[in-house]
Amino acid sequence: SSDVCSSDLLIVRIFLALYMLYYIKRMKKNPKLNVVVVSKCMPSRSATCMAEGGINGVTDFSKGDSYELHCFDTVKGGDYLVDQDSTLKFCEQAGPAILELDYLGMPFSRTPEGKVKARPFGGASKVRCNYSADKTGHIVAHTCLDDALSNGVKFLMDHELLDVAVDNGRCEGAVLRNIRTGEI
């Protein structure tokens, strides 16, 4: 038998950290939002949990770093093949996302002054890779998951997206399959 699940916001998981930060932003604007996350696997088994290095994002502007410089480093690192407008938007959101994770209680590595610690990474021209020991992805995932669960987000594990119903450019529904049972 097929179940019908209703929500105000359906997030189909691609990258754990990204969808969780998106959810957090939306929930802050509308705390009564009914959110459902669809995932093929448990969040703790996602690729995000395997990431060790850190999160590139400008959190310290005092040493000449900027969103534009972060964008340039990213575009250069992508051999100038990446969409520059999208990259700039992403870079502008990375620093605030790191600060939001810090606010949520993510145990970042710290400087002696207590600030989120950053290190050089990936050929960037400035030190902006914010990290949590060598388990950044795992810790990001669990920080976001803890916050989501404490705010009533519903998770549909072991489900995959088959189709979406679009009306006038707006998603009005989704067809999912339970991977374990095959039910639609």
Regions found by a protein language model. Name each.
Residues 1-6:
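Short, small-residue-biased leader/transition segments that mark boundaries at the very start
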Residues 7-12:
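Conserved N-terminal Rossmann-fold NAD(P)-binding element of oxidoreductases
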Residues 13, 17:
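N-terminal Rossmann-fold NAD(P) dinucleotide-binding loop
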Residues 18-21, 98:
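Generic hydrophobic/aromatic pocket-lining and core-packing "Φ" positions
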Residues 20-33:
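A short, Lys/Arg-enriched amphipathic alpha-helix followed by its capping loop at the start of a domain
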Residues 32-34, 39-180:
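Conserved N-terminal/central alpha/beta ligand/cofactor-binding core
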